[in-house]
Amino acid sequence: MASHVVGYPRMGPKRELKFALESFWDGKSSAEDLKKVAADLRSSIWKQMADAGIKYIPSNTFAYYDQVLDTTAMLGAVPARYGFNGGEIGFDLYFSMARGNASLPAMEMTKWFDTNYHYIVPELGPEVKFAYSSHKAVDEYKEAKALGVDTVPVLVGPVSYLLLSKAAKGVEKSFPLLSLLPKILPVYKEVIAELKAAGASTIQFDEPTLVMDLESHQLKAFTDAYADLESTLSGLNVLVETYFADLTPEAYKTLVSLNGVTAFGFDLVRGTKTLDLIKSGFPSGKYLFAGVVDGRNIWANDLAASLATLQSLESIVGKDKLVVSTSCSLLHTAVDLVNETKLDDEIKSWLAFAAQKVLEVNALAKALAGQKDEAFFSANAAALASRKSSPRVTNEAVQKAAAGLKGSDHRRATTVSARLDAQQKKLNLPVLPTTTIGSFPQTVELRRVRREYKAKKISEEEYVKAIKEEISKVVKLQEELDIDVLVHGEPERNDMVEYFGEQLSGFAFTVNGWVQSYGSRCVKPPIIYGDVSRPKAMTVFWSSLAQSMTSRPMKGMLTGPVTILNWSFVRNDQPRHETCYQIALAIEDEAEDLEKAGINVIQIDEAALREGLPLRKSGHGFYLQWAVHSFRITNVGIQDTTQIHTHMCYSNFNDIIHSIIDMDADVITIENSRSDEKLLSVFREGVKYGAGIGPGVYDIHSPRIPPTEELADRIRKMLAVLESNVLWVNPDCGLKTRKYNEVNPALSNMVYAAKPI
């Protein structure tokens, strides 16, 4: 019985690639040094899979930055601004496209489906000259072969590549990207021919866009593309892999009818309906790669349940045509549980990171072949039983409180305009009030203090003194700049989710559970393993301390429940919305305690609300309903005179504007500096959004200091769309990643720009 892994994390068990990349970018090491680290990582991954008995081992899933950018390099689809004149694409050009350079901006980056990974978006148009310009797929296949490992080269499929692209600057937005299919297929043919010549017997095409809402002409593009590739692919085993959701019946029919394709891969963890499609008909003689091991979470697989699913599929496709696989690439999970020395043993027994998932895939394949490892299966069953019955997972009081939420709307009793009137009487703010989003620069010294306190190298007294001084500095600075609503700067927080998770019960934290977000940047999501509750106040001490330093309003700063949920590894033994409601109740307790402590403005950030949107429209309604409801729960008991702010971090609101209004916040600040007036008109078109709105007036992601006149001009443009009594003036995001010598003049210019208007 055969086994397969869709893809594997690239960073290394201790983020070796991250450190090698950053050292190279900083000019501290050579290209050869970087290549050596990368080659060592690849060979250890291939060896690990070979040792685990995996039959179909992927190659070319490694990337120095991103697999879509690798495909752009393979196709020579370099945007004109980089002055590419052909030849093999090297590090300089590759990293310029990814990160920009001194004189040229980077290509755009956006989220990879609904994961927390980001890819570099190809910029295409009718003028692009496609040519085979990176031989990486073939080189890596040969590299593995030289190590004695026969791999399956993985390519981003041609249709998904185009569907994930955008029209380049200067090209009509409506340019039909799929019209470029005849231009890119010749390059794919060259790559396939080279792989064949190098000895490859199986090739994997990732076509994840098949799980999206597709129109008939888009589905036809898949049929056309693989019909065109058919003769080049003859003699090869060809796998088309899909993941992240189930397929519509039309997409399923298109996929299993593709010419020249011998195997189809499905995500059977998130794609629950796909199972029914397979059962209703699967082409005879073709292989089914069954993704039963979850590539997107960190929980141990329920091996007995997976085995039952696989056995039911075996009777449909035949014993020799079924391959056990992961639901998607393991890129989206942590690397290896072995490196978690501080994690509690009981919780650890419930988990499986990428290295453990490879073993699960192999164990399932062996069990199907009649060589079941009884000890492995019974250890798994024992871990699952312990997780089900552990008193650490269940909290009766939380269950009861969450159950009590059903059937109620949880909305503040009065309208937003009545509340704003009450708040204005209390806060007495000027027209065009100024504020910031929350965090201030985190200096090396500040990080050192936090690190030493965590490692118990300094006393609590020393820690509190240092943080207090930092808050005092930030408050004083804002008063000098004449900002109207202040923040305490969040010097005590390392991360907006981790800070709260560490103080809530039901959360666990890893030491090395890093997952790639983009390039060398990794995130370490908390693990929500049990019912969530708040043992004691989390932010009240620091916020009231900050308020005692000024007569101006001080914002309390909380992270919203949907963002905490979407940026964590979430328990899979109850629906996501139930976990979200539990977090909402904990944040509600905190908001009410802040209000009691005299904090009159409370910001509840929902930076990641949009990130949780299901991939297909059919799932949007239910998600938005419970996400918005969760936000409203957090402040339902707050008095009219207390102002609730929220902050959101993306520019595409058109399709969810009604849900944002339904959140019923008093003031909403948004990351708008890049998308400008488009977004503002959304708030006005047909929707009289009565609340305050603070579209970011400058982009904090850039070190550039915007001149006063430019900011004033931007504010005037905003006033052409929004009334002056609702407009707030603020940067577009927190200032944590900037330096004080950038922040001070930028905020000063912002306040000056708002005053005369």
Curated annotation (Swiss-Prot):
EC assignment: the record states 2.1.1.14
Catalytic residues (UniProt): H701 (proton donor)
Provide the catalytic activity annotation: 5-methyltetrahydropteroyltri-L-glutamate + L-homocysteine = tetrahydropteroyltri-L-glutamate + L-methionine
Q: Give the pathway listed in the UniProt entry for this protein.
A: Amino-acid biosynthesis; L-methionine biosynthesis via de novo pathway; L-methionine from L-homocysteine (MetE route): step 1/1
User: Which keywords are on file for this protein?
Assistant: Allergen, Amino-acid biosynthesis, Metal-binding, Methionine biosynthesis, Methyltransferase, Transferase, Zinc
Which Pfam families does this one have? Meth_synt_1, Meth_synt_2
Name the cystine pairs.
Answer: none
Summarize tissue expression.
Expressed in pollen (at protein level).
Which GO molecular function terms does the record list?
5-methyltetrahydropteroyltriglutamate-homocysteine S-methyltransferase activity; methionine synthase activity; zinc ion binding
Q: Record's PANTHER family? A: 5-METHYLTETRAHYDROPTEROYLTRIGLUTAMATE--HOMOCYSTEINE METHYLTRANSFERASE (PTHR30519)
Name-wise, this protein is 5-methyltetrahydropteroyltriglutamate--homocysteine methyltransferase
Its taxonomic placement starts with: Eukaryota, Viridiplantae, Streptophyta, Embryophyta, Tracheophyta
